[in-house]
């Protein structure tokens, strides 16, 4: 019997490749350190190139199958639509309006629902072993052993590292590779509102969009819908900006080495800074000194991971291949990490299908195909954060140019 493929991590990339391999009758086991009830309830943006790749790999499923299962507003018959409009969070005025004729090319997805939907997209259950924290990986391509803290030991043909930015596999196989911290400030809050309160407070500003994007003078305050139930709406918000720290000045909100416990605490400097922003409604009604202590607030440290081709070749000789954030992590704000994780899983599964007898060639082919896409995505993600946090004068210039172009288009139409 062919040894199974061992997948470390039950996130989006791990579940996706397990589901595709399982559908192709290729033995595999997923190992996850956490318990089955772990939650990642926030929503992410799935871009057309990401969800199309996934739907095709799962048997040419229709887009409606996905949106019915994962859209934050699915209970209302929604499709995870966002208007992609930008509003001045000081005045509430619309700055950048989307093209009304543009088709929907981004789907918002509740991350918990997406993981469940992927796992359920097949006849045979995916084999997930929870409570398995990796201790070591040893061996070579075709014969590799994974040992876990609970004493379990499994032999497989290949280890797929799908265990995220802080990858245990990578830290063992490539100990010299560590995440780079991006000098940005990101605070993320989660809250729940009764449906009636949401309809009165947020809907008049957002309409049917699942994101209310507010931009300020070098900072952003998006409010996003994570999930809607019959009685409540789960929301999250972000407060983000580039760090101002340098040799002369310390930025009290830039805490790159914050502990897990400290990351859940609200620093007084955050309350003071938000109060100084003079936000318009509805941002001011959620982001204030009275409301924030009632939310679950996290200080997200933004990290990037980059590896060389020599690095992955060395890991390949030890029977390890990387997918998702384990080899190309991007900042949560402005990155497309979830989409690239899905495409990684699809492309590696395609490379492995029918080539179980030549794993080396399959893994090499996967890297040949994915390399440029992923390396360029990491580079772009760093730039995109700063592009999305412009001075207000630049946003005003962009808004004016958009108006002029729209006016010219209207004249040409007549």
Swiss-Prot record:
Catalysed conversion reaction: 3-(2,4-dioxopentyl)-3,6,8,9-tetrahydroxy-1-oxo-1,2,3,4-tetrahydroanthracene-2-carboxyl-[ACP] + NADPH + O2 + H(+) = 3-(2,4-dioxopentyl)-2,3,6,8,9-pentahydroxy-1-oxo-1,2,3,4-tetrahydroanthracene-2-carboxyl-[ACP] + NADP(+) + H2O
Keyword Translocase in record: no
SUPFAM superfamilies in alphabetical order: FAD/NAD(P)-binding domain
Top-level taxon of the source organism: Eukaryota
Cysteines paired by S-S bonds: none
EC number: 1.14.14.-
Pathway: Secondary metabolite biosynthesis
Keywords from the UniProt entry: FAD, Flavoprotein, Monooxygenase, Oxidoreductase
Cited InterPro entries: FAD-bd (IPR002938), FAD/NAD-bd_sf (IPR036188)
Biological role stated in the UniProt entry: FAD-dependent monooxygenase; part of the gene cluster that mediates the biosynthesis of the linear tetracyclic TAN-1612 neuropeptide Y receptor antagonist. The decaketide backbone of TAN-1612 is synthesized by the non-reducing polyketide synthase adaA via condensation of one acetyl-CoA starter unit with 9 malonyl-CoA units. The FAD-dependent monooxygenase adaC then performs hydroxylation at C2 while the polaketide chain is still attached to the NRPKS adaA.
Family per similarity comment: Belongs to the paxM FAD-dependent monooxygenase family.
Name of this protein: FAD-dependent monooxygenase adaC
Biological source species: Aspergillus niger
């Amino acid at each position: 019997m062919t040894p199974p493929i061992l997948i470390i991590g039950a996130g989006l990339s791990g579940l996706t490749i397990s589901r595709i391999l399982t559908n192709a009758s290729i033995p595999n086991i997923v190992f996850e350190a956490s318990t089955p009830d772990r939650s990642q309830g926030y929503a992410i943006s799935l871009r057309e190139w990401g969800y199309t790749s996934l739907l095709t790999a799962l048997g040419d499923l229709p887009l409606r199958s996905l949106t019915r299962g994962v859209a934050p507003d699915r209970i209302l018959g929604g499709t995870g639509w966002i208007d992609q409009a930008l509003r001045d969070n000081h005045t509430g005025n619309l700055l950048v309006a989307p093209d009304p004729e543009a088709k929907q090319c981004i789907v918002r997805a509740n991350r918990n629902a997406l993981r469940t939907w992927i796992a359920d997209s097949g006849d045979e259950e995916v084999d997930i072993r929870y409570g398995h924290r990796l201790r070591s990986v040893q061996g070579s391509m075709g014969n590799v052993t994974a040992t876990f803290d609970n004493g379990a030991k499994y032999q497989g043909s290949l280890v797929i590292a799908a265990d995220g930015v802080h990858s245990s596999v990578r830290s063992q196989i490539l100990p010299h590779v560590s995440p780079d911290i991006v000098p940005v400030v990101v605070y993320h809050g989660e809250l729940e509102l009764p449906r009636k309160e949401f309809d009165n407070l947020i809907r008049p500003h957002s309409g049917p969009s699942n994101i209310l994007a507010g931009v300020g003078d070098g900072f952003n305050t998006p409010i996003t819908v994570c999930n809607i139930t019959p009685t409540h709406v789960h929301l999250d918000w972000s407060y983000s900006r580039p760090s101002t720290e340098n040799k002369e000045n310390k930025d009290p909100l830039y805490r790159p080495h914050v502990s897990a416990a400290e990351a859940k605490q609200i620093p007084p400097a955050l309350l003071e800074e938000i109060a100084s922003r003079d936000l318009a409604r509805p941002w001011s009604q959620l982001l204030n000194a009275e409301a924030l202590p009632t939310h679950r607030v996290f200080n997200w440290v933004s990290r990037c991971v980059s590896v060389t081709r020599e690095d992955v070749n060395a890991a390949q000789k030890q029977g390890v291949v990387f997918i998702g954030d384990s080899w190309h992590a991007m900042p949560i704000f402005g990155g497309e990490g979830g989409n690239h994780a899905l495409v990684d899983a699809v492309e590696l599964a395609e490379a492995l299908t029918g080539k179980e007898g030549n794993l080396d060639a399959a893994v090499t082919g996967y890297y040949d195909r994915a390399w440029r896409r992923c390396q360029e995505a990491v580079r772009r993600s760093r730039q995109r954060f700063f592009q999305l946090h412009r001075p207000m004068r630049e946003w005003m210039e962009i808004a004016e140019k958009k108006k002029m172009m729209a006016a010219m288009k209207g004249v040409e139409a007549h």
